[in-house]
Every structure is written in structure tokens, then in C-alpha cells.
Amino acid sequence: MVDIRKSLFFIIFFIFYNYVNSQKAINSDAFCQKKTITSICDPYLFNTDSIYIFNSTTTQESIELEIKRLLGFFSMLPSTCQVPSTYRLICNQYFQTCVPISKTDNSSTIAIPLRPCRESCDYGNGICGTQSITPCTGTFTEPTIYKFPVTSNVFDLSSLGGPSNYDLQCLNIDTMKAGNLNGTYISNNETVIVNQTCVYPLVYRNSTNREDDIKKGYQYLTETSDCLLPCPVPFFTENEWYQFKDLTTVTGVISFVCIFFNIFIYGFLNKKHDRHTIGILCLSFSLWCCMLSDLIVASSPDYSLVCPEPGRFARIHDSRCVANGIIFQWGAVCTTMFWSAMAIDLYLVIKKLSLPAFTVKYFVAAIFTLALLFTTVPLAWDDYGYGFGGVGCWIMSNSVQNGCFWIPMLICLLIGAVSICLIIYEIVKVFKNVGRSGISIILANARLFGIVSFIFIEYIYLFVYHFWVQENTEKFTQNITDWVICVQTTGSSDGCPLPKAVPYATQFIFLFFLRLLGIEVCIFYGINSRSKNIILESDLVNNKYFKAIRSKISSVGATSTTKNNTSTNNTSDQFNTSMFSVEVSKNGGDDDDL
């Protein structure tokens, strides 16, 4: 839940009490005025025939604007707050009834405001949950005049030519009575001001079980609000969100096919497994699982996988989301670990060191076991779901995500970094000790060193990206809060800038790098001389059916070659004969000349 409760209550406090505090207890510039505009408060006002205007710069229109600003936040407050008594309190605090008091010489009148009673203020705080930040006990500079009187305020108007001890009873919001004062209020005219809706793109939900809704992934603005955040959160425009999804779908499918090519060669066609081929196969299978999770994302034309309903973020109860998260998590952990294993393997190759076969098997089993552990822990804690970013489901909480992925990744990065440094050291040593004759050793492993280094750079980017986002999470959350307040205040999202979060290009690169891994592994491990030899030595190429096809192709090629040779020979004979004739002719001519 994005809890904007504190910010929301602060805004309400600021608007409501700033208006109250902007008035003086007694203002010589104040005057009474008949209600001249149509207001949403009309049915709730005690007396529309006499409205208190506390200075010359204040108008009924400006008061109405302040009321609308305040009521714009009420859809985010509990439904218990959205009742007639609350509207009576607010409306009569803004459009206060004006009580004219005649001066002692009857030359003119002094305008003083009729204020709601403290009991009404306390009751409004109680049903709205604002009692901790909107006190009802304040006074003006005159300590005997209360902003919300207990029963009445006593005014000393002698400085303005009026009575020195005028007692004005407060307005009881429940009974809409104020001593012996008469008003225009009619109870059956009251209507609900705030409709049970939320400003688009916020989503309204009338909850019957809020706790259960939160578990299902409904993101309420506050603990008591009926408004939900839209899913996905508008950190980006709708078009940009779909660009991310298209990127994931296209590159994910391409990477899926590329990785399957590796699996087919090293898993199905390969007859002779060694440490190197087992490493490639395991790395490829791990990446294939990651890309399989992308196919689950691609299976939905929209964001329904992660946003099953408006305002609901997918959670552990959504089977497709959980499958997407589990498959990706297992594949991602395995990929990271096998990458570090491949870095170690490359160092061993350059050093010409070998490991016993059983060591490799135990190593692979250990990686799969650890990956399974890091995958089941979030499942046990119901932590798979969709957060505020990305296009698919994964681990939601930072603590679990760090413990089950990013910290293991950091360890793998350190292992990989040490291996890369050792490899570079060995390369330098070969150049120094062997000279140019050692270049062949380096060139033979250049592709492998390239892929290990490329993946290392990409992992560093992903690692830094994650912790940068994590470090700025509170800032991004505050940006959401500011955006919500803007939307509710203005009544539209058109004039409100999107909440700032991760830059578009940064997010795009992050998503792209995750899918680029599969294509890179295919290029570096799947397209080389070893994979070619595996294909040529496989049963696929050497079975009787393929041999028959190959022999036919060969016979067709041989026939074509024979014809070409015959044609070439004939052409050569003709050419030679012609040349011979020329030579004879030339020789004959010479004889004649002789």
C-alpha cells in the first residue's frame, strides 16, 4: 500500500486551518453579504442570506474555490467521513453566517462570524480520523475567543464602537441551531457532495473486506481511502509501458529460440560430454527458463498478467503470475551461478588444469539445489507478485529480493571478477614467457573470454540499477503521493506531471540486457567450430535417412560436376584444335614464303 495518509492529512490541515487562521477574531474590514453564487455548499449552510466576508480581497468565488480544493481529497478519506454532518461543518466554517451587531450610536453595524461548536469539530475529526493533526481547541490572539467555541464566544467590540460584552452562541452542526438566531437551513434539502468515485486514473473500490483486498493486491491510497492506485503505476505513459512489453516479447522470443538452439546442440546432439559442454548446457538451460517466463508475459496482449483487475497488482493467488515469477527466479539464479562457473572453467582451460568428473557433477547439483532454495523461500513467504515497475512478476520485497537474488549475484560477480583478473594475468604471462607463439592459445579462447566479460559488464549494470532504484524508493513513493494529491486537487490528471522514477532509457536498457544474454550465449557458444563438429558427428547427420538424402545430393552434385567437366574438356579440345590450326597455318605460310 502506498500510504499517503500523512501527506493527505497535512494538505487537509493546511487548507482547512490556513483558512481559519487567516481570519481575525474581530476584523474591522469584515462585512455581511447575501449569498450570490450557486455553491455545492448551499444545502448545508445555516443562513444563505448573510455570509461573513472577512476582508475586501475575499469573494464568495474564492471561498468556493477553497472548498472545492478541500473536498477534492474527501474521496480518499473513509466513507464514514463522507456524511452530511461533515459537509455542514466544512461549509459553515468557510461560508460562515454573518451576525451584524449594531454600534452603540446605531450609526452602522459590526460584522462578526458564527462559528461551529467544538463538539461538532471533535465529532468530525473522529469520523474522519483527523483528530491527531486538526485540533479543535485553538484560540485567536484574543485568548477568550475560540476558533471552535465550547458553547459561545464573548466579544469585546468597544474598540469598534460596539458593546463590550457580546455573547454569541456557536452553531451546533447536528441540530443546526445557534441560540435564538434564525437561518435559512432546510434539512431535507441536503444532498451528498462527494460522489463515491475517484478522479481518473485512480480507481474506486467499495470494499467489504479491506484486509483481504490488500492481500489480493489492491493498492489503496490510505488505510481508510476507497481510491486505488492504477496498475501499472503511471511512472511512464501508457505508450511507453507497452513499448517495454513489446521489447520483452520480441527479444524474449528471439532469445528463447536462440537458447533452444544451444540446448539442442549440446543436449540432444552431443555424444561426448565434458566439463565445458556441461557448463554450456546448464547455462543455456537456465537462460532458457528465464526466456520461458517471458513467453508467459507475451501470452497476454495487455498487462492483465500483472494487473488482473483495475487497481489490483497480481499476487501469490494469481497462478500465472506466480509461475512467471518462480520460473524467472530459478532461471536467473542458475544463470548467474553457472556464469561464474564458466568464468572459473575458462581460467582452468588457460591454465590447462582439469577436474575429476564427479566434481563437476557435484558442482552442478549444488548450483541447482541452491537455486531451488532461493526460489522456494519467497514462495514460502508469499512474496511473488507484481510491484510498481517492470513487466512481469517476481519477488516484491527488497529484503527477500536482496537475500534470494542480489546478494548471491554479488558473490558470483566477485568470483567472476577474480576469474577475469586471473585470466588477464595468465594472458599477460603467456605473452611475456612465450611471445608471439602463444597468441594461438589466446585466440582459441578469445570468444569465451569475450562472452564472460560481456555478461560481467551487463550484470554490473543490472546490479547497480537495482540498488540505485532501491536507494530512491522513498523518493519515488513520495512522487506518487505528490501526483495523487495533484490529481485529486485539480480533478484531472491532464495537468499533473507523471511521478518521476527511473528514466525511460535506463529502464529500457535494464529490460534489454536481461534478454540480450540469451542471444549472446547463442552467438558465442552455439556458433563455433565445436558446435559444428557436434552436428557433423551426431546421429541426426549420420542416420540412414540423412545419409540417403546426402548421397542423393552428392550424386546430383557429381552428375553436374561430370557434365561440367565434359563440357569443359570439349571446349578445351576445340580451343586446342583451333590453336593448332592457327599454328599450322602460320607455319605453312612461312614455308611458302621460304
Swiss-Prot record:
Subcellular compartments: Membrane
Alphabetical UniProt keywords: Disulfide bond, Glycoprotein, Membrane, Receptor, Signal, Transmembrane, Transmembrane helix
Membrane topology label: Multi-pass membrane protein
UniProt-listed InterPro entries: Frizzled_dom, Frizzled_dom_sf, GPCR_Fz/Smo-like
Residues bearing attached sugar chains per UniProt: N55, N106, N182, N189, N195, N206, N479
Gene Ontology CC, one term: membrane
Name of this protein: Frizzled and smoothened-like protein A
Species name: Dictyostelium discoideum
Gene label: fslA
